[in-house]
């Protein structure tokens, strides 16, 4: 299994989303992180499970939350480039590829 590495911009996406959900309801941010952990484990176990959506970048959708994990697979690692809401402008994450 390849390691899953999260780029700093993607880590900032995740932290911002976690904090926003925590302000909406106590514990909801933790639920978001758990859904993210589940998706990252699935990506690590089978990175080709999710479809390529742009120039070798794949997207895994989170359960229960309207977010996608955008990642690229390389020979030695899987790199997460973004974790964004599905309705965001795709150019925002595409500029990170």
Question: Which residues fall in each region the model found?
Answer:
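Arg/Lys-rich, positively charged N-terminal/basic patches that mediate binding to nucleic acids
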Residues: 1-33
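Enriched for short, Lys/Arg-rich terminal
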Residues: 68, 72-97
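Basic/aromatic recognition patch in beta-strand/loop cores that engages polyanionic ligands
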Residues: 38, 45-77
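Short, hydrophobic secondary-structure boundary micro-motifs
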Residues: 30, 51-53, 91-93
């Amino acid at each position: 299994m390849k390691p899953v590495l999260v780029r700093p911009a993607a880590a900032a996406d995740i932290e911002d989303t976690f904090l926003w959900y925590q302000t909406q309801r106590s514990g909801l941010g933790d639920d978001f992180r758990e859904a993210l952990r589940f998706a990252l484990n699935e990506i690590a176990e089978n990175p080709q499970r999710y479809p390529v959506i742009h120039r070798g970048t794949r997207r895994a959708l989170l359960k229960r939350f309207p977010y996608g994990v955008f990642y690229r697979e390389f020979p030695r690692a899987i790199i997460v480039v973004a974790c964004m809401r599905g309705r965001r402008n795709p150019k925002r994450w595409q500029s990170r590829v």
